[in-house]
Amino acid sequence: MRRRWEYWILMLAMHKIGVIPIPSTNQLKAEDIEYRIEQAESKAIIVFDDGHILNEIKTAIGNRNVQLISNDEVAKSISTMPDTLERVPNENSDTMVIYFTSGTTDMPKMVAHNFAYPLGHINTAMFWQRLHDGDIHFTLSESGWAKCSWGKMYGQWLAGATVFVFDFSGIATAHDLLSAMAENHITSFCAPPTVYKMLIHADFSKYDLSALTKADVAGEALNPEVFERFQKATGIKLHEGFGQTETCVMMFTSQWIEPKPGSMGMPAAGWDVQLLDEGGRPVPNGTVGEICVSLKNGHPVGLFQGYHKNDKLTSKVFRDGFYHTGDVAYRDNDGYYWFVGRNDDLIKTSGYRVSPFEVESVLLEHPAVREVAVTGIPDPSRGMAVKATIVLNKYFQGTDVLIRQLQDHVRARTASYKYPRVIEFVDSLPMTISGKIRRALIRTLDSAKDTIIEPVKNVIGLSKDDEKQK
């Protein structure tokens, strides 16, 4: 289902009677749904006929013994259900909810959270989002993602805040979102960076956002350019948070520390976060390491139990006394953490390690660049070369001159080995359903090309330095 009020009733009811819900986005296709049915051994699917999804589900179910429950049946059940439901006894360690990951690097995995999970979101709502009684909080996520649990249910209610539900079909525009915030006196807003990248192009003077005092961002790393432009438009400093479907918020910018544009802040209370090298040793400040959570004092409240029905993968991430996130970051001398990327996203070129996020942040400062994904492509002389796949702003054209300008722009602002030796201009970037850039897909598409540099230089740009080397 989309963002519908029935979701909250259904979730609470299932928690109470012992049914394990698996919230899913209504943007799935039949193949996606079939995969989820098989992996989870689903017994029933509750669907609200919003567009295509009912037919997709029927196709996915086929002859399987899976009960399909329609919105009419749900409405009838809600209207006739007793005031109280008999609660099925459970332990904190029992599975409460399962989420499928968005599948940025592999097939979606089933993340199992137990009944202590809601308490983990006290950090999320009270200390990251700074919510309290009287707040009206607006998290954009639809109900099929773990971000809905982060921003629309457990922690917010524990904080005494009102949750604002705004449903829309398709893609909401900046006008849609800003109008909703103005008309409903929203005091707190949370969305992924892709939404803020859209909002900063709007004319904020047309909307009365005087009630808005807090804004948060999570989902991917936030480029400093977006932070600064949003603050200039609203006077509000974005508070970045970091976590995964497998966790609640585990690092964030709290009310007690000054936001640093692009930093995800400091570890949450109860989370012993350490940055480890490939040998499992802590790294010093300024050195990139994998974000790991120490388990020496047990699982932090809000950390998942494991991957449902996948002991092999669970043991891969829970090892040597740590939960290994697969994400890498560095810590500065003030104790702030800075996201670098997924381990798989790091580009190793000429013996250096390049963070895609760092190069993307620099490119986004250029007026021509609307969206960008930086990846590595094979290069015989360097191992990997840095490539930028770019969506241009209106009125800009992807010429050789612009390619040189963008390369010079990066070289002037960061180490020379980080500049993109190859630039490709595209109409759009491949995204997951949850709005994250699919860098792995870009790498896969690039790897399918016969050779790396020569065939693409006339199409997507090659620096003069590279041509001389050839």
Name the predicted role of every residue range.
Residues 1-2, 19-37, 49-53, 141-143, ...:
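ATP-dependent adenylate-forming carboxylate-activation enzymes
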Residues 154, 158, 186-191, 200-260, ...:
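Gly/Ser/Thr-rich phosphate-binding loop
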Residues 5-24, 33-34, 125-127, 147-159, ...:
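Hydrophobic alpha-helical segments in the ANL/AMP-binding
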